[in-house]
Amino acid sequence: MRILRHIFALAAFLLPFIASAQFYVTGDDPGRLKWYSIETDNFKVIYPEGTDSLARVYAEKIERFRIPVSLTTGYLSGQGDGRKMPVVMHAYNAANGSVAWAPKRMDLFTLPSAYDPEPMPWSTMLSVHESRHVTQMQFGLTERQKPGKWFLGEGWNIVTF
């Protein structure tokens, strides 16, 4: 019994070192930031203070490319659940983006890379690319897939994607 107690104490001590937080990749924004939002017809863009003009650019681009991107997959972003897609802008990180479905959101890392020049503006490339991932994940919200969502929630999209 004493050995079991020591093993439990050691495991409780080591667990924080091996555990990963939910927002590990995107949680490195400075804690002092104040966050604001802009709502479009289909998206809610959440952005840090001081980047409102950049947020308007991204909001306009993801809204503008919503239908052209959906023509290649057959699904519109926001189709199926009727909620606006949260788009979280991270203006102080690297150049990248990601789409997660549990919780549902699109993360945009808006700082363009100085070492990887693109033929199109970074805001356009990022908006189109991440919008494509959103429409691909809409497949899990179709009528045929709803029973799976009853059991696994938003995690069902991960299984079907």
Where are these regions (language model features)?
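Bacterial N-terminal signal peptides that target proteins for export
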Residues: 1-11
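Absolute protein N-terminus
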Residues: 1, 21-22
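N-terminal signal peptide c-region/cleavage motif recognized by signal peptidases
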Residues: 16-18
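Juxtacatalytic substrate-recognition/specificity segment
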Residues: 23-161
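Short, flexible, solvent-exposed loop/turn segments with mixed acidic/basic and small polar residues
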Residues: 4, 14, 75-76
